[in-house]
């Protein structure tokens, strides 16, 4: 009780009843130090008393980063905070596990992309409540094209992703009901356009002329086949004036910057 930590108003001290030997106490201290390091880095802290996420399985853990990216992309597509709800679907084997931490990750990514105060696993649900957003998670063990799939939606927008291959590479496989396959990137532009010839060249030329390198590009089509959705990953942000110029082109319906 002589430690100066007891005098800090921001620290709540509780007894550790499970460590009855010196060796056990040392291990408990190491665990606490590891947890503090994770918290300071903004990462998920297992066993945190103020995070309602349950025990995170090794099957679910690799999907945390993907879920956060999906939340951030959804925020970009919806141009901020929606008015009603965020729907989160977990399909496949992952639905057999506790996915609460993934729901927190989606919210953390969403509100982190919206901007404002720092967002954590602790305050993300509170932010949803403050904005009047109902969070609707659902689970189905029936696979949808992939062994595991996470889909997030709000309003007219939606994004789905999975982890592919032995190295669990993150993939975005659906945006606004357009099927595609692209790795999430820090700088991305989503272009909605009529499905007519020459659009890839027009968009690529406009971005290239601005001196922005295109690292990846993919085009998705919906079932109707009358429109297409182009996703471009770039090495840096596409300038505002280029986004405006793209949006003004014939046959282009919308241009949105997102962060994956």
Role assignments for model-derived ranges:
Residues 1-79, 95, 113-115, 259:
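Rossmann-like dinucleotide-binding domain for NAD(H)/NADP(H)
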């Amino acid at each position: 009780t002589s430690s100066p930590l007891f005098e800090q108003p921001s620290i709540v001290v509780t007894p550790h009843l499970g460590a009855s030997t010196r060796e056990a106490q040392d291990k408990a201290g190491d665990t606490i130090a590891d947890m503090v390091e994770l918290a300071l880095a903004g990462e998920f802290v297992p066993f945190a008393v103020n995070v309602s996420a349950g025990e995170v399985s090794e099957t679910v853990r690799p999907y945390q980063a993907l879920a956060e990216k999906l939340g951030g992309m959804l925020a970009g597509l919806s141009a901020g905070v929606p008015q009603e709800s965020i729907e989160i679907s977990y399909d496949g084997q992952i639905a057999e596990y506790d996915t609460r931490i993934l729901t927190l990750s989606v919210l953390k990514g969403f509100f982190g992309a919206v901007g404002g105060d720092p967002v954590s696993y602790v305050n993300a649900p509170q932010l949803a409540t403050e904005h009047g957003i109902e969070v609707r998670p659902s689970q189905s063990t029936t696979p949808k094209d992939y062994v595991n799939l996470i889909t997030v939606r709000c309003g007219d927008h939606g994004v789905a992703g999975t982890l592919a291959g032995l190295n669990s590479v993150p993939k975005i496989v659906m945006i606004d009901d357009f099927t595609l396959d692209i790795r999430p990137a820090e700088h991305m532009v989503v272009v909605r356009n009529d499905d007519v010839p020459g659009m890839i060249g027009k968009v690529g030329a406009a971005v290239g002329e601005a001196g922005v390198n295109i690292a990846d590009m993919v085009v998705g089509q919906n079932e109707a086949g009358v429109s297409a959705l182009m996703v471009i990953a770039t090495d840096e942000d596409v300038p505002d004036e280029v986004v405006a110029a793209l949006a003004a082109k014939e046959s282009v319906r919308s241009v949105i910057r997102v962060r994956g």
